[in-house]
Amino acid sequence: MSLATREATHSLALSEPLPLTRHPVAVYLNGLATGSRPTMKQALDTIASMLSGGECDALTLDWAKLRYPHTAAVQAELVARYESATAQKMMCALRRVLTEARKLQLVDAEELVLALELPKIKSTQRLRGRALSGAEIGALMSVCASDETVQGTRDAALVAILRGAGLRRAEVVKLELADFEPETGALEVRRGKGGKDRTVYLPQGAITFVEAWLEVRGRTPGALLCPIRRGGHLEMRHMTPQAVLLILQKRAERAGVESFSPHDFRRTFCSDLLDAGVDIVTVQKLAGHASPVTTAKYDRRGEEAKRKAVQNLGF
């Protein structure tokens, strides 16, 4: 759906390209973590397309020309089109871009205040994602173990790390060999979400799979997990987050496991630790969440956990 007339489309397009150092979108994206940039760029491309009838993207729209009628229309359309969490994230990107436009002196402060004076988007409280069952995780590991190629060994280590440490895929692909301590199972996560470092620990079973991969990979410094070319040739460079998604999709299909996202391993990690009686603050620290409130949102134990909990009440 377009929010623009032909006349409005023309008026919102940049008359000439801006240097990237003066472009509010470029400045905003440059301040984000590398893994967050594609998602937020896509969000801004979508908003630019809505406002211009498909004629502009994030870099060709003149964001400094946006006023309250534009931002209000965008928010209304996003709320109608997406889940509340997605709409909130996209509006956050819009707000940040307009704020950068103000800092770059492209828009008047008063106009910015008016443009951003919008009602809060109400959360639908609908849970996203799911937790994987033990049987599903076992099936994924079995498929990897039955693959006698180096890809099978690497993918088993990948699943073991995602399941055993609950890392984000952007974090797992940045791991270096030096970040893994075999004796304790410690993994040093450097510059995770929010630029924070943390230490997590793999259970013994997961350590075994990582060690098996290192027997194939060798001890050359560099990426802990790396791409593999045809013929089983290892490339000593980091994998991409997209590669992790594709690997998991392929393994899930072969294992007969229902569709899931890489992030569902984090939900499973948090849910299983909470189910095992680990306090929520410890789970929060392991997951790298800024608040235990965020950790609680990852709990996918469902009704069975509540049923078990009340059995502790005495009568």
Model regions and ranges:
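Conserved catalytic core of the tyrosine transesterase superfamily
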Residues: M1-F315
